[in-house]
Amino acid sequence: MKDAVVTCFLACIGAAMAVAAIAADATYLGSWKVSGATAAPWADPKQKADTAEQTRLIGKAVVFKTREIAGPEPLACKAAHYKEKNYTADMIFQGAFDEMKSKDKSVDPSKIAASLGFTGNGIKTVETGCEIDFHFVDATTAEVGLNNTVYTLKKQ
């Protein structure tokens, strides 16, 4: 019985260390600030942007914690389950660029992504397990799509 308790204790410590190691490698953890907003490439130019939402979000802090994202709704996430993935341009913003291409074959998702600052074939994306995925332009810049607007977040 004593051996089982010791084994369980050591396994728990090992699991805790593994979680800490994963969290230490997660460069997205920490404080971010919503620094700007632009009309999303998929937005209908005839529709006006929701400036009230932009005013409510721009300048606000978003804090990525180990198991939670603190910040204004809908960016907050009480039970975050992070998964880092590499998306292609056609996959970011819930596949909006691919949908644009399906309607117009001349649309190039890579060029649209580049217009928002994304470079290369693999776009680091953090899936949160909540409504919003965060797409990273670089280590200090992330973008999210929300209600036909692309919001930029800068690491603090």
Question: Which positions does each model-derived feature cover?
Answer:
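Short, solvent-exposed coil/turn segments at beta-strand boundaries
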Residues: 61-68, 129, 133-142, 156
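N-terminal helix-cap/turn-to-beta initiation motif at the start of protein domains
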Residues: 21-31
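Contiguous, well-ordered beta-strand patches that form the walls/edges
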Residues: 38-41, 64-132
